[in-house]
Design a protein with these regions (language model features):
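Helix-to-loop junction immediately C-terminal to a conserved catalytic motif
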Residues: 54
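Conserved ABC ATPase "signature" region
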Residues: 102, 106, 113-131
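The feature captures the beta-strand-to-loop junction immediately N-terminal to the Walker
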Residues: 39-41
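Conserved ABC transporter NBD signature motif
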Residues: 62-73, 77-78
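Catalytic Walker B motif of ABC-type/P-loop ATPase nucleotide-binding domains
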Residues: 160-163
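Conserved ABC ATPase signature
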Residues: 135-139
Length: 209
């Protein structure tokens, strides 16, 4: 095990006073410069695992460590080191695609110059510039997914968690989305993708769990 790997060690999580088991004694290791896919049926605890990594859900037992830091015990640090694209995107009424991306970068403390440069670049790379100034709640489901993806990757953290990133996305931009993930992996980022699309897993990921 290397310190730069994300180490998930024997984590378990239950809800409803133990009646619902979200995940049970999960152990795995994620690596920089790699795209890892997590596949499984609905209700298998995939989304719960992502939320545990970023610190939104605390496991009942076990630990998650990165660079010697427990992300379970340091949820604030986890949110600084990890970016997440959630399974569902709820755009705010009247907020444009461009504004959605810019706002998350400002929250991260990115300089105003970088906010505009990074936003412009991700819009271009995903070929969604023509919708940049449309309100998010007026966009199609696929474009809302792309908005959420762009928000997670425009100024990427060390670890990037993506929950069903290509759902409802058209074939051309599905490919662009995976190409963007590969670019980030080549830059050293750790990409962890939840998906049901086995064809995409076989074509684009380095390994799957």
């Amino acid at each position: 095990m290397k310190a730069n790997n994300l180490i998930i060690d024997s984590i378990s999580k239950t809800y409803k006073k133990g009646k619902i088991r979200a995940n049970d004694n999960i152990s795995l290791e994620l690596y920089p410069s790699e795209i890892t896919a997590l596949i499984g049926h609905n209700g298998a605890g995939k989304t719960t695992l992502l939320n545990q990594i970023i610190g939104n859900a605390k496991p009942d037992s076990g630990d998650i460590t990165y660079k010697g830091i427990s992300l379970v015990k340091n949820s604030k640090v986890a949110r600084e080191l990890v970016s997440i694209m959630p399974q569902f995107h709820a755009p705010l009424e009247g907020v444009t695609l461009r504004q959605s991306i810019e706002s998350i970068l400002r929250i991260k403390g990115v300089s105003e110059k970088q906010v505009h440069l990074c936003t412009k670049q991700v819009l271009k790379d995903l070929d969604i510039e023509q919708w940049a100034d449309q309100a998010g709640n007026k966009l199609s489901g696929g474009l809302q997914r792309l908005t959420s993806f762009a928000m997670a990757v425009a100024y990427p953290s060390d670890i990037i968690l993506l929950d069903e990133p290509t759902n409802d996305v058209d074939p051309i931009r599905r490919k662009l989305t995976w190409q963007y993930m590969r670019k980030l992996a080549k830059e050293g980022h750790m990409i962890f993708v939840v998906t049901h699309n086995l064809l995409e897993v076989e074509q684009y990921t380095d390994r799957y769990i």
